[in-house]
Amino acid sequence: MRKKLFGQLQRIGKALMLPVAILPAAGLLLAIGTAMQGEALQHYLPFIQNGGVQTVAKLMTGAGGIIFDNLPMIFALGVAIGLAGGDGVAAIAAFVGYIIMNKTMGDFLQVTPKNIGDPASGYASILGIPTLQTGVFGGIIIGALAAWCYNKFYNINLPSYLGFFAGKRFVPIMMATTSFILAFPMALIWPTIQTGLNAFSTGLLDSNTGVAVFLFGFIKRLLIPFGLHHIFHAPFWFEFGSWKNAAGEIIHGDQRIFIEQIREGAHLTAGKFMQGEFPVMMFGLPAAALAIYHTAKPENKKVVAGLMGSAALTSFLTGITEPLEFSFLFVAPLLFFIHAVLDGLSFLTLYLLDLHLGYTFSGGFIDYFLLGILPNKTQWWLVIPVGLVYAVIYYFVFRFLIVKLKYKTPGREDKQSQAATASATELPYAVLEAMGGKANIKHLDACITRLRVEVNDKSKVDVPGLKDLGASGVLEVGNNMQAIFGPKSDQIKHEMQQIMNGQVVENPTTMEDDKDETVVVAEDKSATSELSHIVHAPLTGEVTPLSEVPDQVFSEKMMGDGIAIKPSQGEVRAPFNGKVQMIFPTKHAIGLVSDSGLELLIHIGLDTVKLNGEGFTLHVEEGQEVKQGDLLINFDLDYIRNHAKSDITPIIVTQGNITNLDFKQGEHGNISFGDQLFEAK
């Protein structure tokens, strides 16, 4: 139960990133528009006082502000899409539910425009509806409910005379009903909840703000490995605290208050729960990256320089720290704990210096410039000396502990990994043993990426042993184990089933010859990795980063690096000259190898293995040579959208030694057949 809840919280945390991703664009418009109307920038650029320029500045401020004014609705739509695998039907359901809930609450409580005029009432006008103000929390609740309706009813079957309303069309209907019902308990319970939240936040800030900001920074950083930090910081940024704007409206949340104060040009009081990240992300972590580079073995420094350099630059500019943090998190947990303490101390330091800095995305230089330097409303320059001190601390602490405790940070790994080896015929036996033996297997299945096993006793499963046998990851959901063996997962499942049925497994055709041992971790493909491989788009559609694919196996790159495409046409074409290496029996996935040796997996949609091949038409067979642009598979796009979790199609480089992918057209935007998708090295 606890692990199931943890998994759900992780999904919610990731779903919150979709609406949050909109904020930088809104913040950019708001920050530039506000700065152009301010005396500080006009002093240096007198020409912007021109009436036409000022009109544009006001329009930019309004365009950015409208996003922050409607954050609850945006969170409702974003959370619904994120938890429903990216399907737009969930967003429609969320919008329907959001307006129905607000309208019903307003009518039930008899809220009028006159009531809204009293800031203490807790009422507001939402999309023109006088109703109870539930804030971002209300949006998140509706988004989660819409996603539940989608996941529960998207493939529902109805009698033929109601067939038009079957499948995904049924989801908004159910959402209308459930949100109407939800409105009544929300109307009765939410005022008490809101009062409690306000009392908690006021007490927290009034009792000892210094301790509060330290604990916020410390805990938020510790939650990053679990993906729960988005849930933790949301109430601080969007609900805790209050401030009355010039129009008499009560604004809640540290980030929303900060943005509103920037927009109005008011005296800054917010930013306490954001500003501490600027010294860490712009100075501390890049210095840690330098320490990791300096402690790497000489023969590995060239590779480490590329990895750490790009991670440090990303942290400095954008405040995205995960690429750098995950490079030492698992091999040096003490360093990560110290990093979390320093993060908390950074929040405390800037609070004691009476700074008030905020951001729309993260604590990188871009937000620092737009919302700190340009508005010039606080002593933004104090971040620089604090950051330089942090850089020195991070560098010497990291360098000392890495050397002293012999941490295997990037570039310090042993030359030969202690990889387990198993011959091709031994592997299914070894996997079965690691799963606890035949008696422990309740249900055995597989798809193109993973072995899915429901076990009777999870304690009998040897997770490290599975990883030694080649699983790039092992996921646990209750008694359900998912071992990520990649394209050979189905073959392993088939052979395990034969063993459990008393049959002898001999010379699997999809694996290497028995005379060759399969070395799982240490594999010499240096010749292949030195080549440059051009991959063209196999589909027409919208490019999406793997990190946004709603499947942990792909988003965490357990299968390998790559990208995804949300198709607009139902065709898959060869992305290069090569050969068809493997076709999954249910036709939803195909493995290719290029003439230059690059191995590529194209997985059409998510959970499409459950369609059992329906909606797919093959035009090639295993072992067939293909030319770039040849038609490989036709698929019924409407059928997949109506019957599968998502139509988003991951395109994965399955060779672990190839990690340098250059996305020529970026990781977002539209792409067509034959356009260069990426270059792999």
From Swiss-Prot:
Example of a GO biological process term: phosphoenolpyruvate-dependent sugar phosphotransferase system
GO MF annotation: an example: protein-N(PI)-phosphohistidine-sugar phosphotransferase activity
EC number per UniProt: 2.7.1.199
Gene Ontology CC, one term: plasma membrane
PROSITE patterns: PTS_EIIA_TYPE_1, PTS_EIIA_TYPE_1_HIS, PTS_EIIB_TYPE_1, PTS_EIIB_TYPE_1_CYS, PTS_EIIC_TYPE_1
Catalyzed reaction equations: N(pros)-phospho-L-histidyl-[protein] + D-glucose(out) = D-glucose 6-phosphate(in) + L-histidyl-[protein]
Cross-referenced SUPFAM superfamilies: Duplicated hybrid motif (SSF51261), Glucose permease domain IIB (SSF55604)
Keywords (A to Z) from UniProt: Cell membrane, Kinase, Membrane, Phosphotransferase system, Sugar transport, Transferase, Transmembrane, Transmembrane helix, Transport
Enzyme class, UniProt record, top EC level: transferase
One Pfam family linked to the record: PTS_EIIA_1
Segments forming domain PTS EIIA type-1: 551-655
NCBIfam families xrefs: EIIB_glc, PTBA, PTS-II-BC-glcB
Name recorded for this polypeptide: PTS system glucose-specific EIICBA component
